[in-house]
């Protein structure tokens, strides 16, 4: 909008759109509802922030195929959840054209969807990739940090345990991961919307962060800092890990996006600011 673009927000009406936008109310899971809300509108670019399943992707592909010249879907680093690589993972490690799609899985079951988040995104990517004429981009987003409205509570999880002296559950071999700041991914999506490339692209700041480095940044933010607090880790079995701890190594290589022209920041440089943004005065 700051650049003079007209922005249309489509949601179910449960939350108000930003001021100055055009607001359409529709259920994206209902193809007729979406078609009716859109009418004859067309768009230069569609940015899909809430596509979690292949069923949703099928509907979106049919509805927007004749309505947009570019479709940008926010995907996730979790499409690589089965990788375990000593090197940062490139986009070709998961080729959406080779991913099997199963529309009969219980994608409408919230519990199933929660435990199959990465699989849902993989199959959604595959639906878009199956149509060679559909101009899609899937932005595989690293773990996001920063901002004052983190509804996940993942950094709070660590801060509370550090303050209480409670052990933090991690895998016996705990791998580092790639991250991106919330403002950086917003900039990336805006950049991707205006480019011409297609297909999957990784979005991650330069460098990896360990669970220990996250905890060190949190400790520095606590009153008294490292002189009063220290993170304690406890190795546990699969299924009990704390957030941002990983038994497999699948940090993302950002070389493709860099070659295409996007300039990433360095995770270690923005991490202290991200901690301050998210925790604010809550730890005082």
Q: Where is each model-derived feature located?
A:
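Glycine-rich "substrate-gating" loop/helix at the edge of Rossmann-like oxidoreductase active sites
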Residues: 114, 142-152, 172-183
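Alpha-helical substrate-binding/gating segment
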Residues: 159-169, 175-209
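Conserved Rossmann-fold NAD(P)-dependent oxidoreductase catalytic core, especially the SDR/UDP-sugar
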Residues: 59-120, 137
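NAD(P)H-binding glycine-rich loop region in Rossmannoid oxidoreductase-like domains
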Residues: 13-68, 73, 79-82
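Conserved beta-loop-beta element that borders a ligand/cofactor-binding pocket
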Residues: 122-148
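Amphipathic terminal alpha-helices
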Residues: 265-284
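Conserved C-terminal active-site "lid" loop/helix of NAD(P)H-dependent oxidoreductases
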Residues: 182, 212, 237-264
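Mid/C-terminal beta-alpha module of Rossmann-like enzyme folds, strongest
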Residues: 188-242, 283
């Amino acid at each position: 909008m700051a650049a003079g673009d007209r922005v249309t927000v489509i949601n179910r009406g449960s939350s108000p759109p930003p001021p100055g936008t055009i607001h359409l109310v529709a259920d994206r899971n209902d193809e007729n509802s979406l078609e009716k809300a859109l009418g004859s509108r067309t768009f230069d670019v569609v940015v899909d922030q809430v596509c979690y399943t292949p069923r949703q992707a099928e509907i979106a592909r049919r509805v927007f195929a004749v309505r947009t010249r570019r479709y940008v879907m926010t995907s996730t680093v979790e499409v690589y959840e089965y990788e375990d690589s000593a090197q940062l993972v490139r986009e070709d490690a998961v080729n959406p054209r080779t991913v099997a799609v199963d529309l009969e899985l219980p994608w409408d079951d919230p519990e199933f969807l929660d435990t199959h988040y990465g699989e849902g995104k993989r199959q959604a990517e595959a639906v878009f990739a199956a149509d060679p004429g559909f101009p899609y981009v899937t932005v595989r987003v690293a773990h996001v940090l920063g901002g004052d409205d983190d509804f996940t509570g993942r950094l709070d999880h660590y801060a509370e345990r550090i303050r209480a002296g409670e052990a933090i559950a991690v895998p016996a071999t705990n791998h580092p991961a790639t991250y991106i700041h919330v403002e950086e991914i917003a900039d990336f999506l805006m950049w991707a919307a205006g480019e011409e490339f297609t297909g999957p692209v990784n979005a991650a700041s330069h460098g990896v962060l360990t669970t220990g480095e996250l905890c060190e940044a949190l400790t520095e933010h606590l009153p008294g800092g490292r002189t009063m607090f220290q993170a304690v880790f406890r190795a546990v079995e699969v299924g009990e890990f704390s957030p941002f701890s990983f038994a497999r190594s699948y940090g993302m290589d950002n070389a493709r996006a860099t070659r295409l022209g996007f300039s990433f920041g360095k995770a270690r440089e923005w991490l202290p600011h991200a901690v301050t943004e998210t925790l604010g005065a809550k730890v005082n």
